[in-house]
Amino acid sequence: MSSNNESIKNWVSDKIFDILGYRESTMVDYIIALSKKAKDVNSFISTLTEQDFPINSNTKSFAQELLNKSQQKIQNITSSSSSSSSTSLSSSSSSKDKEKEKIEFLKKNKSYKLVIDHDDDIVNSSGSSDSDSDSERKRKKKEKKKEKKDKKDKKDKKSSTRKKSDNNWDDEIEPEPIKPNEKEDENNNNENNDNNNDNNNLQKRQPYKSIIEEENNNDNNNNNGEEDEYEREQREVKELSDRIKKRDEKSTKKKIVDDSETKESIERKNRLEQNEQLETERTKSRRKYLVGEEQKRLILLKREIEEEYELFKDQKLTEQEIKDFEKKKKLYELASQRINESQQSDDYYQLPSEIKDKDSLLKSSYINDNKNKKGNDSSSSSSYNPEQKEWEQNRMKSAISENRGLSTANIGGGNEEYEYVFEDQIEFIKEEVLKQGQKGDGVMILKPGDDGSAQAKMTIQEVRKSLPVYPYREQLIDAVREYQVLIIVGETGSGKTTQIPQYLHEAGFSKTGKIGCTQPRRVAAMSVAARVAEEVGCKLGNEVGYSIRFEDCTSQKTVLQYMTDGMLVREFLTAPDLASYSVLIIDEAHERTLHTDILFGLLKDITRFRPDLKLLISSATMDAERFSDYFDGAPTFNIPGRKYEVTTHYTQAPEADYLDAAVVTVLQIHITEPLGDILVFLTGQEEVDQAAEMLQTRTRGLGTKIKELIITRIYSTLPTDLQAKIFEPTPPNARKVVLATNIAETSLTIDGIIYVIDPGFCKQKMFNPRTGMESLVITPVSRASANQRKGRAGRVAPGKCFRLFTAWAFDNELEENTIPEIQRTNLGNVVLLLKSMGINDLMNFDFMDPPPAQTLIAALEQLYALGALNDRGQLTKLGRKMAEFPVDPQLSKMIIASEKYKCSEEILTICAMLSVGNTIFYRPKDKAFAADAARKLFFHPQGDHLTLMNVFNQWRESGYAVQWCFENFIQHRSMKRAQDVRDQLELLLERVEIPLVSNVDDTDSIRKCIASGFFYNSAKLEKSGLFRTTKHNQSVQIHPSSCLFQSPPKWVVYHELVLTTKEFMRQIVEIQSSWLHEIAPHIYKEKDVNDNQKLPKNIGKKQINK
């Protein structure tokens, strides 16, 4: 039987390899099991196609042959058993009457049950029936005597037949009831012996019963052991969760501490506030007094000098009296000069375009000294630096002289100003004006020095009333009271995020619980909370607060709480019913982030058993029908669009280089268009930095030919102080350009934006579950996203949107909506998070857009291989620890394994550097050779992970110096980001009870620890010079930026696969093949990683160089 099963497995394995191109033992067993359950060939073929088998003749023939083999095997088994039973029946009786009698007798024997406790009753009842009918018993005894001889002769045959059978329990116990009856006929024929024999029968059957009970007890003990182990594991997971929760409460940074619990704290707080206020008032009063006192003292000094001069002008004074008089006079002159300089405006060189006339250009603003009676030039006598003043005046005279070819009349008129013209200007086609919102707004031209809106001069309440959502306040509140779930649709900037929570708070919804509002990004949550706190008139953290990871700016007074969607998801771990909230607003729902889609499913269940909870889904797009259908036909509340019209301009032909086209368009707008800030959408940090460098290079040599252009940037990893620069008001006679990723598409609102440049691309994360390849791919945006970008221009004035693609491409090549993130990303983190929340049936979880089943299965398989899930699909203690780290499951497994290999310090450094990505080194074009040489100094012969560790350790030894980064061509901003990530991971390491240990010299332990998390991502070098992955059997190559590119090792593990021109492994480290079996014996067998074959020397390098 075993040899037959083995041959079938080998045959199925060969066929699968011929059809699919790879083989796997678990797959073979699975296909064989499917064949046994299949009803016919067609159903079996359809099942195979669901497992990604191609529909062709090979698959159909394979299915037919496998079904034939399975059915033939079953028929052989049944035929063997039936033949043995027929042989025993034919030999046991020669007549049909005897056969019928035996069948009846066997049926009677089967009524004796060996396991049940009431067997004694059955035997006794049978004995009593015999005593009631003597004749019947005697007749049966005579019949049994006749069968006595035949049964003795056939006794051996029956026993041999029973040995050949398939260990059927009925076959083993069939002859036992006959033996005591035979003994009864030979020894005794009276009734008493019948009862005794019945008792003997029970005594002889008792061993079978005890054996069964013993086996059942053993099974129960084994089951109880498994249950105990499972319960123990679940108890450990729960205890770990409780400990983590307690540590969270202690370690979470509380920016606002609520001291209102005791009277003493209230009194102390009031005293401190009174003291601070008193000190502030004292300072103001002192300053005001000093200003007035200064004037009085100066007047008194002047009078004193005049009086002394009148009294002593005709008298001869001593030398000391003359010195005192000169000292007072000098003191008065200095004090007067300082006051005059503080009151006058600085005299500085102005651009010719701003000069009104020649007289104003040459006009001096210096104040003459009244004490100077000698008729000297005022500017020369009162100037603090007369040489600089003279030089500036000479320069201004030469700038307007007629010898330079400019007349003073032209300068003052401003009608004939010259424009700087670029050679590579882009021609745009203007689309029809799309009027959305208010009509009749005339075209507004921004004047020099205007900030783009009148909101700067308006009070906060006036600004609130000017927003589009304000006229619909009462209708919105009535709709929230009437419906439990409400879909709100309004364009970005209409006031949904800042005003709706305040309206609900003012209407009394916060009396029964907090009003929560989620944001997809932490930057948005912090900035919006600060704005709302300013509008409410409270300190941030009191009535209005925010909550992001590692930072909690809330208190017990907080009634309006802004948070990231990930924080609300994590609140389900501790409070599944969200009892502290009365209203929840899911903002920017149209972005369909990973956590937003999870919240949809969780909140949909909560609203069904919490009728008091109000749920508002806020979206900036018109795709509200899908949200309404998902939430059981929830009504939709529409808010009108933007206040000003936006014109759209398309290019006449497609642009080959959209980044260069965006830079040219910025300069073109800056030269030819009226004042107003520019917003440029780019795909990522690299493009933002590159565009900023290109703009600085092209404007550096223009000088006064163009007006001032302020270049700012915004992306998620940018430091907070640099992010805040985009919100600073633009100085007069200048223009600000904001280079942004899609973070500025909906999450941030920047005032003063008049022009939007949309290249039509964005960077999306894509995941292929078949190859396990996840990469960021630059893809065209959707039409909904393009309209979102366009809407950023119509907030404060009529705007323009310049799209760097054709109108035909917008209508025919762009998708209608963006693919949800949950359908194009690795679900390892999602599955781990849902499992930690106790949601086990992931296949039937109510997603709005369910992820591909193959992606979900791949995530479950990966988590099981990593040890995060047990064989029941439940979360293990290791998995509960892994869920605490905001990184990929493979990285979190590597961090937890560092406790075993005693290298947690080094692993934290490596994880932090890997999280930064590929922005560590930079390579200027003019210093490429020096940059490459500096980078090679950090190379480690065993892999890129250790190279990154060297970079961080040397930077730390230099005292985190900026100059060290500059000298080694390393981006200091990326290193600071890695340092922040490492600090966060170190705090989490303490939460999951893992000590911090350093072992920098033991590189084998570090590489083993890396392999313990990334054993799935292993690859072996082949004779062709290419690598082949062991899991997916895919040909890949080492990325040219790797330190092992020139001398590839035989076995490596890689951090990620990147699909560019080829499939590249990025961030690799050398391992030994035996480690794979040692770390993951459930995945790699010893024969799979047996490495006896030797490769020719440098074969990999030769093939790669080809």
From Swiss-Prot:
- Positions bound to ATP: G490, E491, T492, G493, S494, G495, K496, T497
Output compositional bias ranges, type Basic and acidic residues: 156-167, 232-283
Q: Which GO terms describe its molecular function?
A: ATP binding; ATP hydrolysis activity; helicase activity; RNA binding; RNA helicase activity
Q: Give me the Gene Ontology terms describing cellular component.
A: nucleoplasm; nucleus; spliceosomal complex
Q: Where does it live in the cell?
A: Nucleus; Nucleus, Nucleoplasm
> InterPro entries from the xrefs?
DEAD-box_helicase_OB_fold, DEAD/DEAH_box_helicase_dom, DNA/RNA_helicase_DEAH_CS, HA2_WH, Helicase-assoc_dom, Helicase_ATP-bd, Helicase_C-like, P-loop_NTPase
- The EC designation for this entry is 3.6.4.13
Family under the similarity heading: Belongs to the DEAD box helicase family. DEAH subfamily. DDX16/PRP8 sub-subfamily.
* Protein name in UniProt: Putative pre-mRNA-splicing factor ATP-dependent RNA helicase DHX16
Originating species:
Dictyostelium discoideum
